[in-house]
UniProtKB/Swiss-Prot annotation:
It comes from Bifidobacterium adolescentis (strain ATCC 15703 / DSM 20083 / NCTC 11814 / E194a). Gene3D superfamilies: Phosphoglycerate kinase, N-terminal domain. Pathway: Carbohydrate degradation; glycolysis; pyruvate from D-glyceraldehyde 3-phosphate: step 2/5. Substrate binds at D20, F21, N22, R35, H58, L59, G60, R61, R117, R154. Keywords: ATP-binding, Cytoplasm, Glycolysis, Kinase, Nucleotide-binding, Transferase. This is Phosphoglycerate kinase. Monomer. One of its GO terms (molecular function) is ADP binding. The keyword Cytoplasm applies. GO terms for cellular component: cytosol. The keyword Nucleotide-binding applies. It is an enzyme of class 2 (transferase). It is found in: Cytoplasm.
Length: 401
């Protein structure tokens, strides 16, 4: 994979950078700027070389239409604050305003192009349509840097097709992500423990499938655990359950046993009569995992499971965690996720290499107040890090070879 140093002298060059600025918004307020901060090392490195930095990114799912609420204006403002400069936002992605703003740039300037997904061609399934659109974007730059790890698992105009039109390389963030995830999947220090949570087994099938041949231990929590408990013959009440995955999960359990992979499931859970919409809905109780009443649902792992998971995680040299242990947005059901985060922090302090997979786990870690340097690596890519762990070839990385 080509990296920044393979691009040579970039002084005065127009460098197109595909970043990942898909940040959560509350109105026009950014509630977690982690992804913007993650892009700063590449932006600063290019500015120091005297490059003209042209940033592009998507926000939300505007489905190829201009949706004013999904403008990158809040991102341009936050970038300006973090860099201590003005970052102009072009009114379009490759049209007259983008061209004018790029033409007015001096060395070291930064410009942000408007949301690439305002253009239907960006996510088109027609390669020719995407390629023609990518050429229009590529005309703005002389070199392409791919630094949006959150989108490398997709073949889209601004991260895949543009790379065919310009000399292309990975930015510092993508390089860091690939190094970290490779360290967990290629000859990892053992024991390798993989902790999976989140709501659906179906989202993680490929990961489980691949890791049953690689990991020493799989720890399963979150909503997906109830399908595993059901496959063991337990009743799960009204908990989240994927009936159509029970046979698959039984197969995984058999394979784990055959491969000598330790499969760790919750031994107790925190239950509630309903999925909590507000504080009034909460009447939690802790029961054994094989004693969930018919009219209650599991919403977090219980205290015994928290200790069990903690001990298994700390007894590892490499840990990968993807997906929360419960409904962490509600404080009553956040204890399991907190316990796993704390276990990773403890494992890191004891010398283990730890990765927090992107998406919900990364948000949970930040929202629950854990220090970012408590973990070896917090990934910025949810789907991308999962597909990397599945052993899939990621199109956005392949084009950088």
């Amino acid at each position: 994979m080509k990296t920044l140093k393979d691009l040579g002298d970039l002084k005065g060059k127009r460098v197109l950078v595909r970043a990942d600025f898909n940040v959560p918004l509350d109105g026009t307020t950014i509630t977690d700027d982690g992804r913007i901060k993650a892009a700063l090392p590449t932006i600063k490195a290019l500015r120091e070389q005297g490059a003209k930095v042209i940033l592009m990114a998507h926000l939300g799912r505007p489905k190829g239409k201009v949706v004013p609420e999904l403008s990158l204006a809040p991102v341009a403002a936050r970038l300006g604050e973090l860099l201590g400069i003005t970052v102009p936002l072009a009114a379009d992605t490759y049209g007259e305003d983008a061209q004018a703003k790029v033409a007015a740039m001096s060395d070291g300037d930064v410009v942000l192009l408007q949301n690439v997904r305002f253009n239907p061609e960006e996510t088109s399934k027609d390669p020719e349509e995407r390629a023609a659109y990518a050429k229009k974007i590529a005309a703005l730059g002389e070199v392409f840097v791919s630094d949006g790890f959150g989108v490398v698992h997709r073949a889209q105009g601004s991260n895949y097709d543009v790379a065919a039109d310009l000399p292309a390389a990975a930015g510092l963030l993508v390089e860091k992500e690939v190094k970290a995830l490779s360290r967990a999947t290629v000859n990892p220090e053992r024991p390798l423990t993989v902790v999976l949570g989140g709501s659906k087994v179906s989202d993680k099938l490929g990961v489980i499938d691949n890791l049953l041949d690689k990991a020493n231990r799989l720890v399963i929590g979150g909503g997906m655990a109830y399908t595993f408990l059901k496959a063991k013959g337990y009743e799960v009440g009204t908990s989240l359950l994927e009936e159509d995955q029970i046979e698959t999960v039984k197969g995984y359990m058999e394979r784990a046993e055959k491969n000598g992979v330790e499969l760790v499931l919750p031994t107790d859970v925190v239950i509630n009569p309903v999925f909590p919409k507000s504080d009034e809905d909460i009447a939690p109780e802790v029961v054994a995992a094989d004693a969930i009443p018919a009219d209650k649902m599991g919403l977090d792992i219980g205290p015994e499971s928290q200790k069990l998971f903690h001990d298994k995680i700390v007894d590892s040299k490499t840990v990968v965690w993807n997906g929360p242990m419960g409904v962490f947005e509600v404080p009553t059901f956040a204890e399991g996720t907190k316990a796993v985060a704390q276990a990773l922090v403890d494992a890191t302090a004891a010398g283990a290499f730890t990765i927090v997979g992107g998406g919900d786990s990364a948000s949970a870690v930040r929202n629950l107040g854990f220090p970012e340097d408590g973990f070896s690596h917090i990934s910025t890519g949810g789907g991308a890090s999962l597909e990397f762990l599945e052993g899939k070839e990621l199109p956005g990385l392949k084009v950088l070879d």
